[in-house]
Amino acid sequence: SESTFAADMVPETLRRSNLGLLVEGDRVNLERPVKAAGRLGGHIVQGHVDGTGTVDAIAPDGDASLVRFTAPPAIMRYVVEKGFVAVDGASLTVVNCDSDAFTVTIIPYTRHNTVFGSRKVGDLVNLEVDIVAKYVERLVSPHDPGPGAIVSRRR
């Protein structure tokens, strides 16, 4: 029906996400994927959860809300000011960040049409960092690309 969705979850998903904590009736964000010929209005969100974070603070900011999330170093290394991060599947712009936390603005539309309207301090959220950042790190890291690599590193 229009209000239900079923999916299988593999152990990797349960290890990296908060989905194992959900109970029947809990709300989740579910969006249709963008078509290749469609408009990309945010960043590429694959739906692969990289890890979890915690809602640390929520403060009003005009009609919007500033929401601060704490996250582990493995996530924070890819979070930059004015960059993108997916929180519970929603592509959001980072307002600011430091070594262990980042803040986003939740506009009224997002608050009313996603799970953010019911989020509170202490809630565990799913985080997905920008895939481009992970690829760039991999490409510029000082490792041996191995035989058959398209690009070799000059020494």
Question: Positions of the model-derived regions?
Answer:
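Conserved loop->alpha-helix
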Residues: 1-155
